[in-house]
Amino acid sequence: MSKKNIKKVVLAYSGGLDTSAIIPWLKENYDCEVIAFAADVGQGDEELEGLREKAIKTGASECYIVDLKDEFVSDYIYPTITTGAVYEGQYLLGTSMARPIIAKAQVEIARKVGADALCHGCTGKGNDQVRFEGTFAALAPELTVIAPWREWDMVSREDLLAYLAERDIKTTASATKIYSRDANAWHISHEGGELEDPWCEPTKEVWTMTVSPEDAPNTPERVEVSFEHGRMVKVNGEALSPYQCLVKLNELAGAHGVGRIDIVENRLVGMKSRGCYETPGGTVMLAAYKALESLVLDKAALKYREQIGLEFSHVMYDGRWFTPLNDALLAGAASFADKVTGDIVVKLYKGQATVTQRRSPNSLYSEDFATFGADDVYDQSHAEGFIRLYSLSSRISALNKEGIPFKNTGIE
């Protein structure tokens, strides 16, 4: 669709520097109506305060703010937890999880208002452009997608600030606000500025969701969490909604410096990037979930669930939520999650979340079998035959290698 044919655009709007500049840019370059859309995924009231007024002052005809907190936690975070997914062994996928629900809601607004185009403010170097546009392609292939960072000639924060100043558009952004941050109920990410140098240690000013582990209380705190069929339902015996459970754990774990990571990751677009992430409540939830899994799943089931988690981490990171593969992976994880019911105690101390107690009505653990003391339920002599069969292929391989005939070796 040519620029002349685009009449109404729905913009994924955050109120930050990029999307503040995109509104007037769209009107100037596409001569179209701009409708702003913002998703409340638990980033905090301060991020949403005055957002509608700001969008309209900047040139939007309307701004829709949609509360997605409960849906985000119930339909995206919890299914992800059941897969056990951790991208490249460290990243708990906080930004990745939020993109499909935001893009889906943006499509729904576009359909509601009769828009013919969708717009996002993602950089042409990042993962989010793929995540947003992959969702658009899956849910609204007929709508045109506009990506200003791949069109305009502005390349820096200073360029954007100058662009807004020329149009007398006020913004709270400044050239000194160097970090790029993205927050939701699960986490907050920090990128940019001196963090782009992997040899530069993050200062205390980088972190906003957790206290420094060095400054955390000198006394550990224990928190008990309860799951039913893979969903957390209680924190310290108090029944809470999925979203409230996460909020509570963010508060408790953040006070003990839990959930910080500083990593270099492989972006989908081919380059490496350095990011600092805070996921306090999520770190506790995932540790507790996996501890309960280890109690209720047998060896083969747990191994397969781990394979699901590895594949799912890339599906989620790469923006492939709305795909048949993702549906299959989540269905597999859900079948295992149905058994994940029970209670876990996690000790929070100086940046660490350590599981110390576990119980489940579905537990496969038997103290009678596991004891190192005397028992009447397990005949240890039975292990000999098992080991002989288990190691048979290794024994045959060794005999072949040494040229020893099988005869009189006990194999024939």
Swiss-Prot record:
Full protein name: Argininosuccinate synthase
Organism, scientific name: Pseudoalteromonas atlantica (strain T6c / ATCC BAA-1087)
User: Among its keywords, does the record have ATP-binding?
Assistant: yes
As for family, the record states: Belongs to the argininosuccinate synthase family. Type 1 subfamily.
Q: Pathway, according to UniProt?
A: Amino-acid biosynthesis; L-arginine biosynthesis; L-arginine from L-ornithine and carbamoyl phosphate: step 2/3
**EC numbers for this chain:** 6.3.4.5
Q: What are the record keywords, sorted?
A: Amino-acid biosynthesis, Arginine biosynthesis, ATP-binding, Cytoplasm, Ligase, Nucleotide-binding
GO: which molecular function terms? argininosuccinate synthase activity; ATP binding
Gene name of this polypeptide: argG
